[in-house]
């Protein structure tokens, strides 16, 4: 008995393929003698819609605050019924978690690349600041949520990853500043912890006023910011 091979079919014919019955383990053929194949699921459209809903939810959380935001409010902004939103997410907590995890994962991809590049302390500081402003450009609403809500969210087991990320932030920035002092790139009398807090807060607060697509790119804002900060902490020649 000759094996049955799939036939070459058009996209329209592929969509009409017949599923193999669980009661008949051998492949059944269609009227052309072809092995039927299942239509591939359209995952890209669903993923795109999910991304749109997360973007909408992030803007609502950032504007109204997490506690004051309901699933219905998010659904209203997305132009859909609240029940339809549950098709994509089981709760507003799951939406917020995904928003924050996506932001932090992308941020740490950039930070880890900078920290592994072997740059000097001044160049590392410049690169970390620039990467931070790029993340504000990509995830402005998520940064605003992180700034306003993380202190309260870390008490929940679901958001314990925020505390872990904060510890990584502190270690990365403090080690860079301490290395700069040790290598005489930064002033010897620099209070590294105070400087870290100043830089951290003044960078992230930009999410409250920065709007993507404005007259200044994130790189330009980073250059302007660094010109002020580095004039204050760098060793004067």
Residue ranges, per PLM feature:
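Amphipathic alpha-helical packing segments from all-alpha helical-bundle domains
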Residues: 105-112, 138, 156-183, 193-197, ...
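Generic detection of well-ordered alpha-helical segments
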Residues: 47, 51, 55, 59, ...
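N-terminal intrinsically disordered/low-complexity leader segments
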Residues: 1-48, 55, 59, 237
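Helix-turn-helix
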Residues: 52, 56, 60-94, 98
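Short coil/turn segments at alpha/beta junctions that flank glycine-rich nucleotide-binding fingerprints
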Residues: 63-67, 117-118, 139, 183
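Hydrophobic alpha-helical connector segments
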Residues: 98, 112-142, 192, 196-199
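Amphipathic alpha-helical segments used for helix-helix packing
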Residues: 124, 137-157, 208
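Amphipathic C-terminal alpha-helical segment
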Residues: 134-138, 145, 175, 179, ...
